[in-house]
């Protein structure tokens, strides 16, 4: 979804700064944006859980662009290869919990802290924190069958924390012309991940719209929050979930 957001913002004329620890794919996306939209994107290999890295990123961005209009905190980590990543809650490894808390919360904290300083000096800025419906409600284990919910307890815990960190920052920076909002996403269909037709059917039946989300379903909400169209919106949680949380 981060790649999709990069395209959407670039298409609107923004010079996007891509931040990831995966250098090769990040550079590929940078070149793609540059070629398609004729903007001036950049990509940096940065570990957002390390304060020094984020401080360096701030310096690099300011050196090239002189300002920061929008910060989208979209990064999160779900351990994929650990042998116990799917362990039940009662036996879930503490090291995986700590790893997820670090990437899913510490990264947002550090990026908001360092780029919030820039926005304070500019006297203007927008921060958009990406969360999930499972930061609002518990996952319905019944739709996952024997495999259980694919993303363990830390996912719900950190995504819920994102929503309230947004509210805190919006209130903290009141009257500073820095707007902070959450964009909460419903489940997004991915043909590479969602090969279980029963899961897709069960998930779709729990939404009012009757299907899983498509990546483009979130374009409008992202552009709304990033633009002056939402200048009277801060501390809000914009939920785009096909009606999942409405009943």
Can you annotate each of these PLM segments?
Residues 56-63, 82-91, 95-102:
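Active-site Tyr-X3-Lys motif and surrounding loop/helix of classical short-chain dehydrogenase/reductase
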Residues 86, 146, 223, 234-247:
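Short C-terminal tail/terminal secondary-structure segment
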Residues 117, 171-172, 231:
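Alpha-helical segment proximal to the catalytic Tyr-Lys
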């Amino acid at each position: 979804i981060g790649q999709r957001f990069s395209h959407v913002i670039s298409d609107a004329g923004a010079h996007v700064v891509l931040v990831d620890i995966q250098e090769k794919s990040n550079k590929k996306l940078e070149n793609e944006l540059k070629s398609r939209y004729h903007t001036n994107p950049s990509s940096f290999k940065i570990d957002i859980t390390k304060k020094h890295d984020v401080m360096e990123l701030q310096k690099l961005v300011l050196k090239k662009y002189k300002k920061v209009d929008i910060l989208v905190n979209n990064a999160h980590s779900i351990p994929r290869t650990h042998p116990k990543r799917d362990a039940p809650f009662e036996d879930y490894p503490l090291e995986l919990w700590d790893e997820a808390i670090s990437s899913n919360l510490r990264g947002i904290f550090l990026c908001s802290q360092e780029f919030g300083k820039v926005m304070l000096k500019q006297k203007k800025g927008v921060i958009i924190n990406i969360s999930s419906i499972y930061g609002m409600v518990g996952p319905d284990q019944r739709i996952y069958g024997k495999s259980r919910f694919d993303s363990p307890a830390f996912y719900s815990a950190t995504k819920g924390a994102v929503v309230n960190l947004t509210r805190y920052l919006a209130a903290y920076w009141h009257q500073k012309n820095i707007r902070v909002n959450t964009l909460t996403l419903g489940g997004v269909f991915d043909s590479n991940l969602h090969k279980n037709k029963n899961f897709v059917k069960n998930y779709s039946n729990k939404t009012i719209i009757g299907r899983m989300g498509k990546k483009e379903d979130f374009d409008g909400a992202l552009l709304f929050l990033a633009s002056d169209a939402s200048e009277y919106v801060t501390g809000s949680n914009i939920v785009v979930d096909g009606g999942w949380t409405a009943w």
